[in-house]
Amino acid sequence: MPPTPTTPAATGAAAAVTPEHARPHRMVRFNPRSDRFHTLSFHHVEFWCADAASAAGRFAFALGAPLAARSDLSTGNSAHASQLLRSGSLAFLFTAPYANGCDAATASLPSFSADAARRFSADHGIAVRSVALRVADAAEAFRASRRRGARPAFAPVDLGRGFAFAEVELYGDVVLRFVSHPDGTDVPFLPGFEGVTNPDAVDYGLTRFDHVVGNVPELAPAAAYIAGFTGFHEFAEFTAEDVGTTESGLNSVVLANNSEGVLLPLNEPVHGTKRRSQIQTFLEHHGGPGVQHIAVASSDVLRTLRKMRARSAMGGFDFLPPPLPKYYEGVRRLAGDVLSEAQIKECQELGVLVDRDDQGVLLQIFTKPVGDRPTLFLEMIQRIGCMEKDERGEEYQKGGCGGFGKGNFSELFKSIEDYEKSLEAKQSAAVQGS
């Protein structure tokens, strides 16, 4: 793992940087600690899909995240099949409905609706249904959210074993789920799930969710709604001028909880550009607002990428094309005091992007869409630096260390634009040939 940076971004070797990296980040350093309820961390992200075993199997293979728990016919659940993948504190849940007429009372997820799940899959393909937060008290989080204008999705329920569960609407058909449970519980996930042991499981080094990004038609009302009922504060903002290309752009804001360990960025499309915004493309193919991408943190993203790329051609995930070699000359000037020459060369070989703010360094890479539609994708990420100590003297990393890749947005946008252009060219050729 690369060492922690010892010099600020604006001094030393990092002072001479490429123009893209030279532009200042609009990072909001003031933390008002304004949460409406005590939010501890991400708990899980749930996908609704047509077949849980198939979807979970592909993600497990691609990410090196083994099956950790299940709830299905084998556990007495005839309403839905759910499979949980886990790596570190990272938890991906995949849920699919069984046939019509099954006993809804056997569901381990109390808010599950087979009819709604079928509509969801038909409307969105494989997509995120629930962004779940671990909170101190799910019932209180629900009540506090409702008092501040949150639209209810599922009222609080006691699951037993000290677990509580509730949901409010987030954006589109996505819900924000509240889960509370005692520390040190021996329940493998939620009551009703059975643990799965796999002594031969692989480990690619994935540790946790870093952030979960939503695409919406209009940023201001969506951000005001979510910030209003959660109390989450603005952590960063970007505009089309900051992060677009000459052909398209977006506006974005990042919301964060008190600890800044839960980060919820939101994007909106910019209209009137040469090309249709990539955010608008998402909204059209997804069928409305939804989760655009999930950033997954790694303790060593270069190792993680070597493992993942080895499986790309065998059913794993594909990655966006790497930037041109000249990009990495800028990386040497930007982060050569933190990354060794061997590490920079490996970043170039693997297509990893590098950025830096005044507190830390960011390594990131993006997959191509993981389903049939050009919508949901993943980001693999490593943050370097920003280490602090809590009141117990234990070291931890500040949330959002190294920023959100503002210096790489133009590179990312160009890569996605090229990918979309290739799809459009093939569609045009197919139409002309018909």
UniProtKB/Swiss-Prot annotation:
It is found in: Cytoplasm. Pathway: Amino-acid degradation; L-phenylalanine degradation; acetoacetate and fumarate from L-phenylalanine: step 3/6; Cofactor biosynthesis; prenylquinone biosynthesis. One of its GO terms (biological process) is L-phenylalanine catabolic process. Binds 1 Fe cation per subunit. Fe cation binds at H211, H293, E379. Residues 7-19 have a biased composition (Low complexity). It is an enzyme of class 1 (oxidoreductase). CDD domains: HPPD_C_like (cd07250), HPPD_N_like (cd08342). InterPro entries: 4OHPhenylPyrv_dOase (IPR005956), 4OHPhenylPyrv_dOase_C (IPR041735), 4OHPhenylPyrv_dOase_N (IPR041736), Glyas_Bleomycin-R_OHBP_Dase (IPR029068), Glyas_Fos-R_dOase_dom (IPR004360), VOC (IPR037523). Pfam families: Glyoxalase. It comes from the Eukaryota. It catalyses: 3-(4-hydroxyphenyl)pyruvate + O2 = homogentisate + CO2. Its EC number is 1.13.11.27. Residues 41-192, 208-368 form the VOC domain. Keywords: Cytoplasm, Dioxygenase, Iron, Metal-binding, Oxidoreductase, Phenylalanine catabolism, Repeat, Tyrosine catabolism. Its cofactor is Fe cation. GO terms for molecular function: 4-hydroxyphenylpyruvate dioxygenase activity; metal ion binding. Residues 1-21 are annotated as: Disordered. One of its GO terms (cellular component) is cytoplasm. PROSITE patterns: VOC. Belongs to the 4HPPD family. This is 4-hydroxyphenylpyruvate dioxygenase. It comes from Hordeum vulgare.
